[in-house]
Amino acid sequence: MYFGLSEEQESIQDFVKKFLADNASVDEIRKIANGEGEELEKNIFDGILNLGINTLLIPEEHNGLGAGLLHAVAVAQALGAGVGPIPFVGSYVMAPIAINLGGSEEQKNNYLPKIASNELRFGIGMSEFVGAREDAGIEFSKNKLNGRALFVLDAENSDFIILANKSGNIFLINAKDKGVKINKLTTVDKTRSFHEILLENVNAEILALTEDNNEIAKK
């Protein structure tokens, strides 16, 4: 039995590696990490999206490729090897999985095609579910979220943010809501963005609030 990547997956991986080798040198990545290459970072991001990585986990009926997680793994490996400063895991892996598994048909129709067309970017915060902290937590009541979420991935420049609470309930909020405050956290890897999200009476959509929500959050 063969346990390696398929020819298609290797091809996608090679495209990403080649793009980064041609467009993201160590010096350029260093500038981005030091906050000196905003336009450069945008150009790299736009170029990577032209390879279609944002469509991998979007079902075909929502204008995506309908590929599997191994395709995403292949891309993630290539981005890691090239130190690509791309918000891939939040917007284009975890968000599509959460919406596809936990969203209503209306939510799927509204969000998934816009991820595929790069109209929307998502931040995602699952840290409260996988490792809650005493000084943080979110509470949901009357369709509102309040509280503090830590280590939210890819929240910077996102349009929406997906958050999980301690029970594994998953919620979706507009990042531009007046009750949302986003603070960047300092981490070791400056090519990745993690944030603290402060929430005050923020309108929230329920993405998964069922007896099976734990399974969706785990995935």
Task: Identify what each model region corresponds to.
Residues 2-8, 12, 81, 181-219:
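Glycine-rich beta->alpha junctions and the first turn(s) of the following alpha-helix
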Residues 16-26, 105-107, 142-145, 168-179, ...:
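Long, well-ordered alpha-helical segments
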Residues 84-105:
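N-terminal glycine-rich flavin-associated loop
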